[in-house]
Amino acid sequence: MPPSRTRDAIFGLIAGAIGGLLLALALQAKGMMSDTAGLIGLTSIESGICIHLLISAIAGAGYGSLFRYLPGTYAAAISNGVIYGLIWWIIGPLTLSPILIGQGPSWSLNEAGASFLNLTGHILYGGFTGLSFYALVTAFEKLFPNTLEPSRSPAGPPTRIAIIGGGFGGVATTQRLERLISLDERFDATLISESNYLLFTPMLPEVASSALLAQHISTPVRAACPNTRFLRASVDRIDIQNNKIRLQPGVGLPHETMHFDHLVLALGSVPFYHGSKSFEEHVFSLKTLEDASRLRNHVLAVLERADVETDPVKKEQQLTFVVVGGGFAGTEVIAELFDLTHGVLHYYPDIDGDELRFILIHSREKILPELSERLGEYSLQKLRERGIEFKLGSRASAATADALILDDGDRIGTNTIIWTAGNRANPLLSTLPCELNARGAIRVDQFLRVEGLANVWALGDCADVKDPQGDPYPQTAQHALKQGKLVAENIVATVNGEQPKPFHYRSAGIFVALGHRTGAAEVMGRPFSGFLAWILWRGLYLSKLPGLEKKVRVLFDWILDLVFSRDIVLTSEPFERSALHPSVDEQDFPGEM
């Protein structure tokens, strides 16, 4: 069994006190300790330090209890500490301090700016607390190795666990299994994925807008799950009755067969075009690194063409960008592309900013239905103020190479249509003897076990997971991560003859970036908007990004984006010589004939 939460809370308390001491020294250097004491009516510096250390220790205990200890994850401990410090900055200086002095919090940009020194200190406190926590528990484990559960040898063949899918759900399942069965020889786990990397999909719009490099948001699966066998292969057949799957390791290579005792389906989803061939042929999706890179290069290529275009109709089509779907993905990608194009216009002297046109098509009357009505309206207003057009209550009916046709017959001339209006579960699921919902996802019970099958589990986008009220849980990375952890725990519990646990999860926060350093967020039911929401969005996603190296690279990309224009280098767009220049035979070379 994993170490107790109490132990981690105790070491977190010690680490918090250490981090708090360093923060106290920094605050005292600026003469701010007396302000802390003044919050409860005291004046001495000593009182301020004592109060500060007490709060820091309590916060540290919360860190240890919340994030727990996992060997080999010092980078995650630091990044979790950074986001934890950011949260305490919001709770403390931005919220509780104004309340205690009778002013009330405003969460304004001016208030956040005035508290910038406190922000820096809290981030350093969180990072050092995370590092201290990891170092303390690691040292304790080395000094007292008997606190770890001894290795358990199998009485017979090990239980074979096959996880199909290397996205958030599949990797979360694998990582949790590594923690639960690292010393247990009764289990043998294998992760199978067509890609050898975990893609951080929430950041794909920033790759498409040239704000981040593609490789910076992808982490090698072998690095994320170092103690699990990994197979880079596609699965083209699953035999549920005989507990085996057929693998295709690569083009031209022979098929392989693999047997399992427990199967985890984390196959994700694919774009769903509602049966329209025209959408399949003429729109851009945003599900993979290749999709994001292709869209980026296309946008830059049409800017290059528009800068030399003499036909006003063609130029209008080239400079019109349409996004279909007003959820998180559609809203974020249109905001990011707006920032990209307007931020690089100085490179294109023959394109005027007023010629750029951005249109979002959404079938409902409000965008971002996951947010509260107030934040949804705020987001709509902010994007409209920037010049983005919205056609709400409209549906796309067809697409061509130079236009999008709506259900009311309206035709929008454009060379760029981005589809975020719907996904469907992986088509492989339709070959299984399982009940599927309307979007092709497998129905599972409350334990995330496929209905009617005791040894097959499903999660993430390919599973129909219902909340206690019978409504489907949102298809988000947060839910996939939680589901992956629970599936791992339930598999181990089932093998051990224990009762599996039902899935219950309430998201701590919802975040959306609106471009131009603006965002909207709901954290524990509390709405945030503007610059503070944008900071929260970036802080959360940075903390969730796997691997310290990737976190540092993304952080530097963000910093550079504040100072420099975005990169406009085309990396894969073919040079269309026939479209831009006449052939040699058609040209007239005076004096050579």
Task: Specify the residue positions occupied by each region the protein language model found.
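Juxtamembrane/disordered regions of integral membrane proteins
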Residues: M1-S151
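Beta1-alpha1 glycine-rich phosphate/pyrophosphate-binding loop at the start
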Residues: S153-R237, F321-V322, F328-L371, I418, ...
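FAD-binding core/adjacent interface of flavoenzyme oxidoreductases
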Residues: A155-P158, F230-V322, I418
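Short hydrophobic core segments
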Residues: I163-I164, M258-G268, A396, L404, ...
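A Rossmann-like FAD-binding core segment of flavoenzymes
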Residues: T228-L247, V251, F338-Q446, V450-G452, ...
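FAD-site-proximal beta/loop scaffold in flavoenzymes
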Residues: E281-D311, D402-I405, R411-T416, T420-K482
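Rossmann-like dinucleotide-binding core of oxidoreductases
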Residues: K314-L371, Y378, E389-K391, P474-A493, ...
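C-terminal, flexible cofactor-proximal segment of oxidoreductases
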Residues: Q483, A488-M593
